[in-house]
Amino acid sequence: MLFQEEIKKNSQDIAQVFTYKDIEENEKNGKISALLSLEEGAIYQREPQMLRKFYEQGVRMATFTWNYENDLGYPNRFYNPLEQKMWSAGETAGLKEKGLEMLEEMEALGIIPDVSHLSDGGFYDVAKYAKRPFLASHSNARGIAPNAARNLTDDMIRILAEKGGVMGLNFCVSFVRENWKPKEDGALLSELIRQIKYIICVGGEECIGLGSDFDGIEEAPSEMKNAAGLPLLAEAMEREGMLYSQVEKVFFKNVKRFLKENL
């Protein structure tokens, strides 16, 4: 597996984690922790045993969909080839029967359900049937950027927070910017901070982390082109009046708390 090959080549700096104890051990040894996750439920081939095989390979977090309908459920935005346009699934299109089976199997194995990319209806199904906290790894607030249907509504943010979950701030400009238009420059740090403050206002300080999606977005933030620029965001957050304790929560403490309780 390419993931494990890369880990092996860089083993002096990074190590795969399977449990929270592995994260603690990596911290002691000065190593970065890498948690293997899956994005796109079709890869499970509708079979719980496939999910078990992925778990054995170290998968500890997984989505139900990517950008297309599959046997588990619906994405929040998908392309309708008959009408040649993008559609939002909304609240009526939830998890399918196989999706509910996979949710149950995920929780039985210890794989954390990830609701990013999932339809509104799918989110509410996970919220209803999940027995443990879940997360949205790279989703923002729809209250600011409604053009991105994959963002979470205020109601979703509150539910996620009440259940002990976290959401990772996506740096993609269309997920960040109000009234975004195609071909605009990347998001500004001030726009990322506006999202962070909004999410904290809706769901509290414990529910927000970073889910940059650097490897999946076309336009990185204008002032932060890759992960090396993250200290710039931390500095900007303090300049914008956020407490250092809040910066710590957003950057690592909230996600660490979530993983300690659920990994």
Question: Predicted regions: what is each one?
Answer:
Residues 1-48, 64-69, 73-87, 92-107:
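A metal-dependent hydrolase metal-coordination microenvironment
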Residues 170-171, 202-225:
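Short acidic/histidine-rich active-site segments
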Residues 46-56, 78-135, 149-163, 190-206:
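Histidine/acidic residue-rich metal-binding segments in metalloenzymes
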Residues 166-175, 180:
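A conserved active-site cap/scaffold subdomain adjacent to cofactor or substrate pockets
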Residues 19, 58, 113, 138, ...:
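Conserved, mostly hydrophobic/aromatic
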